[in-house]
UniProtKB/Swiss-Prot annotation:
A motif ('HIGH' region) lies at residues 58-68. This is Isoleucine--tRNA ligase. Binds 1 zinc ion per subunit. Belongs to the class-I aminoacyl-tRNA synthetase family. IleS type 1 subfamily. Its cofactor is Zn(2+). Keywords: Aminoacyl-tRNA synthetase, ATP-binding, Cytoplasm, Ligase, Metal-binding, Nucleotide-binding, Protein biosynthesis, Zinc. Gene3D superfamilies: 1.10.730.20, HUPs (3.40.50.620). Catalyzes the attachment of isoleucine to tRNA(Ile). As IleRS can inadvertently accommodate and process structurally similar amino acids such as valine, to avoid such errors it has two additional distinct tRNA(Ile)-dependent editing activities. One activity is designated as 'pretransfer' editing and involves the hydrolysis of activated Val-AMP. The other activity is designated 'posttransfer' editing and involves deacylation of mischarged Val-tRNA(Ile). A motif ('KMSKS' region) lies at residues 605-609.
């Protein structure tokens, strides 16, 4: 054989079988950075239509986790695919840099502001800490192969961004959406600050659940409403609550106007009591109270009870009955204890009746000094004391402990309270913001489409947005308020612009250093500076304006896409929508895409305590970033995204299939010159023309899937093409022609041309997902080319040509099926040691008339398709009893071992081996390929 080895066209490539990605990727990254690849891409798209994906800024605290990786990789796939589609798609990464988590980290190091360090020093320490966190996260994102303007990201703490945040607030104020009010807000007593809705998490909590009696002030008036003459003892209205600590702030009892209420007399422990309960809840209440007997004395609609008065159970005043639509009969008594200072529904209904918004609780969760009985007690600790006092007063009907879902601080993981405080709000209704935002939601494309109804419900039900915080590290609310009237300065808008100009030069510290007299002159004594800071959700939510407007890359183009996790419907998508609609009357985005959360193989959330956390850094160091990128792309992100070591191993296996395909392609076009050796598609062997046609059709499907952000469809179709059409069919068939045909014959060049065209297309198909591997392939492709695939567009060289004489795509599909059946028979024969390789087999195909005619079209070339030394076609009706059944009703098979000599060069068993005296071990085909003009192939 050694004599003829040099006559074969053996595959050869520098592209290694093993990716060794963990070691090879960092070398490529270094090259990309040194060559300024991101800028090269930007330069290649000057003047093209822009596509703007605006980055939702991750918080600058801690290492990135797998969810961050998913998010950034999805964005990167989109930006790269849009670039391939010819768009100018800049990507400016951002970071959220203000807020409580950073304050807490800095407090651990330097203490609270005003103690060991001044507030100004504290802010500087926060800035330093955030910058360091950004650097760490940036390195991790770069390692993932994400292309972005990493040298010039946007940080919400950049001076110009801070200034633009102030300018955006000025525009919101100018549009009439800001108001100040005393309202109940989510309040964390550990933070000492209001919380945004997105900063509230719901966890199970054990709480006291109590039924409390409020005795009627005028028993006769009450009985008259129920058309009852008399009853035993006093008549009371009963409330049920899980927050006894809010009872000092009770100012009313709410009933539903349409519900029926019943005056019930019951006996318990020998004593008779008379109470008012919702009719629908009487039986459940009596059961809970453990009464011996009960009877209904009378019935009345809730609206008939309006403004009756009842004594507070332990304070010396009485409260009215009011009507509220928020009252339900889902649980409790059908009567709601109403404390306008401690609940949103309570506040809203209280406003209608002009109730006092009592707030006896301080910032730290302790009752204020003027709170009767409970002064100085922490509210949660006071619960037991309230219960004890109610029992002492004879007002406690039932006391038990229940587990229920309760709001907790996202940072401290501790229960929070609702507490009325003076705050700044963006009003949802005073200028029609809610209605406008709902209209804008309809104009936006939501992916998946359920995102629309989700955010609609949130906007429909959300309260006014409390944008003020009582924190040190944040963008200040740069307003001057009149000391007596609490009115804003009449020149607030122009004053805010002057302050913004200072912040642009000096950062937010400029506000704290500002002497009011510098701006207000003689008026300074009448006004005070607001000391509140903005909710960090305002920082990020205004970035469509504060960032996009200031970056020349965006050319003033509107944002096309926001892409974040599904929790951002109530977070960044919401805050951005509110601010943009308040400022500009329209949504900031055209499309909003959400991805699910990452969970482990058992569907559990990632948790250090469970020990199921998969860190992206570990994956890139062990398997390489391309494996992580392939997992992200292959997973349907519309639901939960499952990841585990086993799943990543499967991704690595899938990656190997793609890599092996690429290696085969490169190894077989080694030395191919696209300028001189390329065979026109119409002159190719039919099988080659078919595979190019398939690749062209696939490219259209892949581009469409990329455009619809269906990356799992991209990977599925790509894997199918590599595994089935190429791996199991085309590449297997062409090996004989590729290796044994004359080196420069049309038969071989046709095949190489097809492989070359597929390689040029495929390297682009995988570039958005397997970026490192695509670059590796690109560097080894033959022909003149730009340095990087990432500056290219989708390949235009795939011509979908079908000649009149061509076999149809359906024909090749049928042949693929026949070949699959033949393979099964050959494999069985190999397992039974009947033959060694497939070329030792001679196959008889017993086919019906239609299939016989189809197979006969290929003539002698059928054996190359079936990878056997000899084939013969016989009528199905002539099949012997021992013919092998297949899954095709039109086909049976026969196999026997070839008896002819084996050609030393091509390994086919042929009767003509040794016919040429000079080459006694070769078939005549091989002699032609060595010494003659080379064999001619028409079909395969």
């Amino acid at each position: 054989m050694s004599d003829y080895k040099s006559t074969l066209n053996l595959p050869e490539t520098e592209f290694p079988m093993r990716g060794n990605l963990a070691n090879r990727e960092p070398v490529m990254l270094k090259s990309w950075t040194e060559d300024g690849l991101y800028q090269q891409i930007r330069d290649s798209r000057i003047g093209r239509k822009p596509f703007i994906l605006h980055d939702g800024p991750p918080y600058a605290n801690g290492s990135i986790h797998i969810g961050h990786s998913v998010n950034k990789i999805l964005k990167d796939i989109i930006v790269k695919s849009k670039t391939l589609s010819g768009f100018d798609a800049p990507y400016i990464p951002g970071w959220d840099c203000h807020g409580l988590p950073i304050e807490l980290k800095v407090e651990q190091k330097v203490g609270k502001p005003g103690h060991k360090v001044t507030a100004a020093q504290f802010r500087e320490k926060c800035r330093e800490y955030a910058a360091k966190q950004v650097d760490g996260q940036r390195e991790d994102f770069i390692r993932l192969g994400v292309f972005a303007d990493w040298n010039k990201p946007y940080l919400t703490m950049d001076f110009d961004t801070e200034a633009n945040i102030v300018r955006s607030l000025a525009k919101v104020i100018d549009s009439g959406h800001l108001h100040k009010g005393v309202k109940p807000v989510h309040w964390c007593t550990d933070c000492g600050s209001a919380l945004a809705e997105a900063e509230v998490e719901y966890e199970d909590k054990k709480s006291p659940a109590i039924d409390v009696a409020f005795a009627a002030t005028d028993k006769a008036a009450l009985l008259a409403k129920f058309d009852v003459q008399d009853c035993t003892g006093s008549a009371s209205m009963v409330i049920w609550t899980t927050t006894p600590w809010t009872l000092p702030a009770n100012r009313a009892l709410s009933v539903s106007p349409e519900l029926d209420y019943v005056l019930v007399e019951f006996v318990k422990d020998g004593a008779t009591s008379t109470v008012i309960l919702a009719d629908a809840l009487v039986e459940s209440c009596m059961e809970r109270y453990g009464v011996e007997s009960h009877k209904a004395l009378g019935k009345a609609k809730g609206q008939e009870l309006e403004l009756l008065r009842f004594n507070h159970p332990f304070y010396d005043f009485d409260v009215p009955v009011i009507l509220g639509d928020h009252v339900t009969v889902d649980s409790g008594t059908g009567v709601v204890h109403t404390a306008p200072g401690h609940g949103q529904d309570d506040f809203v209904v209280g406003q209608k009746y002009g109730l006092e918004v009592a707030n006896p609780v301080g910032d730290n969760g302790v009752y204020k000094a003027d709170t009767e009985i409970f002064a100085g007690q922490h509210v949660f600790k006071a619960n037991d004391n309230v219960v004890a006092l109610l029992e002492e007063k004879g007002a406690l009907i039932k006391h038990e402990k229940i587990m229920h879902s309760y709001p907790h601080c996202w940072r401290h993981k501790t229960p929070i309270i609702f507490r009325a405080t003076p705050q700044w709000f963006i009003s949802m209704d005073q200028k029609g913001l809610r209605k406008q935002a709902l209209g804008e939601i309809e104009q936006t494309q939501w992916i998946p489409d359920w995102g629309q109804s989700r955010i609609e419900k949130m906007v429909e039900n959300r309260p006014d947005w409390c944008i003020s915080r009582q924190r040190t590290w944040g963008v200040p609310i740069t307003l001057f308020v009149h000391r007596e009237t609490e009115e804003l300065h009449p020149d607030s808008i122009s004053l805010m612009e002057r302050v913004a100009n200072r912040i642009e030069r000096e950062g937010i510290q400029a506000w704290w250093d500002l002497d009011a007299q510098e701006l207000l002159g003689d008026e300074a004594e009448q006004y005070r500076k607001v000391t509140d800071t903005l909710d960090v959700w305002y920082d990020s939510g205004s970035s469509f304006s504060s960032v996009v407007a200031s970056r020349p890359e965006y050319q003033g183009h509107e944002i096309d896409l926001y892409l974040e996790g599904s929790d951002q419907h109530r977070g960044w998508f919401m805050s951005s929508l509110m601010i943009s609609t308040a400022m500009n009357g329209k949504a900031p985005y055209k499309q909003v895409l959400t991805h699910g959360f990452t969970v482990d193989g058992n569907g559990r959330k990632m948790s250090k305590s469970i020990g199921n956390v998969i860190a992206p850094q570990t994956v890139t160091n062990k398997l390489g970033a391309d494996i992580l990128r392939l997992w992200v792309a292959a997973t349907d992100y519309s639901g939960e995204m499952t990841v585990s070591d086993e799943i990543l191993k499967r991704s690595a296996d899938a990656y190997r299939r793609i890599r092996n395909t690429a290696r085969f392609l490169l190894a077989n076009i080694n030395g191919f010159d696209p300028v001189n050796d390329l065979v026109a598609v119409e002159e190719m062997v039919a099988l080659d023309r078919w595979v190019v046609r398939r690749a062209a059709a696939l490219q259209e499907e892949l581009i469409e899937a990329y455009e619809q952000y269906n990356f799992h469809v991209v990977t599925q179709k790509l894997m199918q093409f590599c595994s089935v059409e190429l791996g199991s069919f085309y590449l297997d068939i062409i090996k004989d022609r590729q290796y044994t045909a004359k080196g420069d014959s049309v038969a071989r060049r046709s095949c190489q041309s097809a492989l070359y065209l597929i390689s040029e297309a495929m390297v682009r198909w995988i570039a958005p997902i397997l970026s490192f591997t695509a670059d590796e392939i690109w560097q080894l492709l033959p022909g003149e080319r730009e340095k990087y695939v990432f500056t290219q567009e989708w390949y235009q060289g795939l011509e979908s040509v079908t000649l009149d004489s061509d076999l149809s795509d359906e024909y090749w599909e049928q042949l693929l099926t026949v070949r699959g059946e033949v393979n099964k028979v050959i494999e069985q024969a190999r397992r039974e040691k009947q033959i060694g390789g497939s070329l030792e087999a001679e196959i008889t195909l017993y086919a019906d008339d239609a299939l016989s005619q189809a197979l006969a079209t290929l003539g002698d070339e059928l054996r190359f398709v079936l990878l056997t030394s000899k084939t013969q076609i016989v009528a199905l009706s002539s099949a012997p009893a021992d013919a092998i059944e297949t899954e095709m009703t039109s086909l049976k098979l026969g196999l026997h071992k070839a008896e002819s000599e084996k050609c030393e060069r091509c390994w086919h068993h042929r009767e003509d081996v040794g016919q040429v005296e000079a080459h006694p071990t070769l078939c005549t085909r091989c002699v032609t390929n060595i010494e003659g003009d080379g064999e001619v192939r028409q079909f395969a």
